[in-house]
Amino acid sequence: MAAAQAVEEMRTRVVLGEFGVRNVHTTDFPGNYAGYDDAWDQNRFEKNFRVDVVQMDEDTLEFDMVGIDAAIANAFRRILLAEVPTMAVEKVLVYNNTSIVQDEILAHRLGLIPILADPRLFEYRNQGEEEGTEIDTLQFRLQVRCTRNPNAAKDSSDPNELYVNHKVYTRHMTWVPLGNQADVFPEGTIRPVHDDILIAQLRPGQEIDLMMHCVKGIGKDHAKFSPVATASYRLLPAITLLEPVEGEAAEELSQCFSPGVIEVEEVQGKKVARVANARLDTFSREIFRHEKLKKAVRLARVRDHYIFSVESTGVLPPDVLVSEAIKILMGKCRRFLDELDAVEMD
């Protein structure tokens, strides 16, 4: 029985010890363990695989993906970072820039501003094309001039009161429709995601006047096209109490973990520790600093249970980004199968 439990732990758990991490390699391949049928089976995979949405709001999404290998999870993460397309500033035509920010630095800043535009409605611009069209380009104008405020108090030293337009924000960017874009996109739908991003600061007499061309691209070409601020995953924590922990030791144990992981209950007049929500733990391994407690707890992670966290830049909702990443991964698989079918067998 103990041997079977040890094998099951090696197959399904990554164990965090005091001086190292065990079972880090995937070992559930055919023939590795006697009595285990680890051969690939489509029906079994479909039965065990699931996706559970845990939390979602306007910009963030947390979901569980269960029943997959690390290679698939990491491929999915990399697609979110580098292969889901967005629209971003690619070319900046500077007509006048008398601010202290150099033209090339200003253009770089503008490129990193997330643009609220659905990239699925646009095409990639063909390489070598200089002039954009309504199907592959968005155009923005930025024209701001700083002047003195004639109504400012004489003893004021606050630039916000002394000057007009001394701070250039993304709200100053004006969309200039190309072709029939004004008919396709309602007013206010094409704009920077946030209107309070500071671009530059001016002083009286200084001016920025330029035109921006936004094109469709992917993060693999440039990070400005990446649709996510963060896209990460971690394995589901599995914390097990190997022996009862009571009294002051229970309180001490709860302090070794993230809030909410260990709860202390009153049982027959005694304080008793129990694992309440292992998911919340960050695995600081603080428990191994306490000689009396470290043997009472086993820290592990479930090998095939991935907790994904996706934070959108605001260009698209996070659930849309995830669905687009799934489509891209499916397309890669189809192309791979087509290549295999095209190979002539000897």
UniProtKB/Swiss-Prot annotation:
Organism: Mus musculus
Biological role stated in the UniProt entry: DNA-dependent RNA polymerase catalyzes the transcription of DNA into RNA using the four ribonucleoside triphosphates as substrates. Common component of RNA polymerases I and III which synthesize ribosomal RNA precursors and short non-coding RNAs including 5S rRNA, snRNAs, tRNAs and miRNAs, respectively. POLR1C/RPAC1 is part of the polymerase core and may function as a clamp element that moves to open and close the cleft.
Keyword Nucleus: yes
UniProt GO BP: DNA-templated transcription
One function term, GO molecular function aspect: protein dimerization activity
InterPro entries noted in UniProt: DNA-dir_RNA_pol_30-40kDasu_CS, DNA-dir_RNA_pol_insert, DNA-dir_RNA_pol_RpoA/D/Rpb3, RBP11-like, RNAP_Rpo3/Rpb3/RPAC1, RNAPI/III_AC40, RNApol_insert_sf, Rpo3/RPB3_RNA_Pol_subunit
The entry's keywords: Acetylation, Cytoplasm, DNA-directed RNA polymerase, Nucleus, Transcription
Full protein name: DNA-directed RNA polymerases I and III subunit RPAC1
Modified positions (N-acetylalanine) in chain numbering: 2
UniProt cross-references to CDD domains, sorted A to Z: RNAP_I_II_AC40
